[in-house]
Amino acid sequence: MTRVGRHVLRLGAACLLLVGGLASSIFAGSSLGFGSTASTATSTATTATAATTTTSAAAAVLAISGHGWGHGLGLSQWGADGYARHGWAYDRILAHFYTGTTLGQAKISTVRVLVASAAKTTLASAVPWTVTDAAGQKAVLDPGKLVLERSPAIAAQPSLAPPFTFASTQPIQVDGRAYRGRLTVSGAGKVVQVVDRLGLEAYLRGVVPSEMPSNWPTEALKAQAVAARSYTLANLTKGRAFDLYGDTRDQAYGGVAAESASANAAIDATKGQVVLYQGKVADALYFSTSGGRTASALESIGSPVPYLVPVADPYDTLSPYHDWGPVLFDAAKVAKELKLSAPLAGLEVVNGPSGRVKTVTALSNDDTQVTFTGNQLRTALGLRSTWFAPVFLQLLPAAKTMTVGGAVTLTGSARGVDRVSLEAKQAGQTEWSPAGELTVEPDGRFSTVVKPSLATQYRLAWGTVRAGLAKIAVAPRVEAVPGPSGVQGTVHPLVAAAAVQLQQQAGTAWTTLASTATDAAGAWSFAGALVPGTYRVRCAPGHGLAPGFSTSFLVQ
């Protein structure tokens, strides 16, 4: 064993520079693979959805509401909480969520957990610690920090062979978070990987309270402990440097800081217990919230798993994610995210036995269709689950100017709903007012005629959703009568002192020649003969009216 003080050790693919208790490491980089797996367990921590009116200024929006959070397979954590509060013991809870299973004992095992994978990471120990290379050579490190980062290796130094294992009589910190067990460090692609190797029961102490609040009922915590233990043993991986990710790609692992007395007690009370199906450890998937019913493996992943079938989950209603939404998405951004060839015109879904979406077809304005799985859309839009219902709302035109006394036909789509209403806000008003119910055709289309007298904004109203903004500007009717000694006319509606301009066309532009204002009767005039050219009269009355123009006239 070598005592490391103030010098450099060449460690194969790495180089450690220690100055007193402070060390830095330079990894030359290996080509070890760093793969990724699909997320299985889902943490319960997030922000609750607001129940207030949700508004979007986009002309077309996608409003999605749903139930639950997570993949829906296996044990519902909020459901376990609910069952425990209704007097169920943990074994009964587990038997309910994992159909046809029993409990049994597993062999004592160790687990390798990836706790860091970054270009730079810092290890620290408050007491003397050791580093051992792949050949078994060992060196003692003084208490302190060790910064590990990728960089070209320093040559011509005493060598140790990677990977390197760090051990201490106290938990070692990785980027400020303490972990039990031994830490193995290696280069993987462009990153430094830190893998924590420790006993299964010690690992669970950092998992159970990270996946489920430690102040939940004891029986729920016991069910979580058995599920997490089972999932771990069913997913030990060969052929790579670690078994599990230390986050929700597998299970959230918070290390020493996450540990709690109540979670530890639940782990100890169920020590070694696992969920078995026909004598084998079950892949005991779990997730946050079902929304009232769990999913089947067949509808979620395409392959049947006998113990992962839909079951009722009536007691997860305490979860803030039992129901969620509506969440609004700008339809133009959704079309871009889904790589559609034309603007989005709606979504059509096919539901599985549990109500979750199996497939969703995106409809485009050019009549093309693209089909996705429910999971693909969930990932693309960041939805909480695949149990959702989309509503497409669009109001056209987004903007238009009309002449007072005329009418505008508003058209649009309301797919996924039977009824939708129109709201209006006139210039000068601060509140929106109901403007009538719209009749939605079977294909989702609707149309309605509006006759605003002033500039008015319209939008669609469905439940708490307000979307599809259309701005209709209203211009005055300007009448101009040219004569040999000038031009005169009137403005309707009558607005006294409204600004009036005489304009002449110059190429593609219009030049203002003279200005005046309307009298008390809404009349105006410009005196003086006009030279040959094309003219028009512009009136900008304000008071909620847009500028209006007369018909252009030719003077020869």
Predicted regions and their residues:
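Conserved, single-site charged/polar hotspot
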Residues: 2-485, 493-494, 501, 529, ...
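Short, acidic Ser/Thr/Gly-rich low-complexity loop/linker segments typical of extracellular
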Residues: 436-442, 514-521
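Hydrophobic beta-strand segments within extracellular beta-sandwich modules
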Residues: 458, 535-537
